Amino acid sequence: ASKNLEDKSGGRSGTIATIARNPEQSKHLETARMNVLGHEVDFVNLRSEMYAEDSRIPEIQIGTPLEDALRRDITINALFYNVHTRSQEDLTERGLPDLREGIARTPLAPLQTFQDDPLRVLRCIRFSSRFGFEIAEETGSAMQEQSIQDALVRKIKRERVGEELLKMLKGKSPLLSLTTIEKYGIYDTVFGVPPDVAGKTTGTQRAQSTGIHAASILCSFLDSVPTSLPAPHTELLKQAHEDHGLRQRLIFGAALTPWRDMTYPQKKGYLPVVEHNVKEGLKIGSQNHFIPSVPRLFAAHKRASKPSLDKFEGPSQRALIGLLLRDGDVHNPRTGTHWSTSLLFSMVQDLVDLIDDQNTLDDVQAQRIVQIYNVFVNRVLELDLVKSIEEPPRLNGKEIGAVLGIKPGKEIGIYMDHVIRWQLEHPNESVDLCKTWLKELHQSPANGDSGAATPPAKRARV
């Protein structure tokens, strides 16, 4: 093939790589890989599979074209293209009709093929969502069988479940993927916590529908879908539109809404169950900032829920709002957390709380919630706070120590908090004026003999 390509096109195909056999990972036959016109192409034998009852890793042997087609997850993926006759070959006799009619169907009896490899359940959902296909009735019924859901838990490593979910989130219709997962009763199977963790949790799990509601509201905002609600401030949407990875994290976080009020014990105290969902339940971890940014979306909601301006009354409204926006749960570029999307997610959570048991949103209160956030963002812009969110302290720890004549330690951190609050109150003042103010604060009678100032509130509790 390599030589023929070079003879026909005059181009180079590059080196031919061999992917070795690895029976422990279901690689019983070698694969050759070659670059063809800038695309990596795998050359493989036709294969047949034999499954053991307790494993999804099959024994693979060289097979016939029909055997190879039947082992595919859905019929449209079982289509062949014959390079000699330049024609399509539909050995299952269902692939082309299903492609025309928009149906996702398994080539074999769905109950058996899902028992053999339960991951095919998620692949079927992913492809149906990607192409906007309907899942065949018998295929959907098999997905709902308890034996299949048990097999999905027993046979499939959580990393593989997480990989399939990430592909859904990166696809064109992540919301459709989530609603399909919920429709066929595998929401807890995909997102939930194992029994050994569930038995130790505190708090109450919300209905699965809250995850779908949250994702639906979020996607309607991100995609500018007309609803009865006012449009969110454009500043809340800008970052998510520019960063596709951030959009994925927001939708994933919305899907975890049912577990938002739950914690589980660890050696260092109680941790949010949503952190377990991401890190252990789906083994997604730190890739693309899913950890820690997804759990921090929920932490930010606790800090920023319904941020009406009357909650920021004080000597300096600019400082109070600025301290909230600088909070590490609300904004931290190193972890992929941005203040605008933290507020957007918080607004979505507040709106979900307004949906009653009949799945009806209180439109009057919902419009009020959106207006509160829009007014808040307008005030952030009026106060020119965006540039102050990531501004470093005017004085670092070493400079504070030199100005006040104190040694490194906890006291430095206390004064650092004061410096940050001061610069939020006085955005245009000089470093020298900050030093003068800091000396006066340190020497003021209110500090007593120790010279240690009482730290300002690090966060605006709203």
Residue ranges with predicted function:
Residues 1-462:
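Catalytic cores of the polymerase beta-like nucleotidyltransferase superfamily
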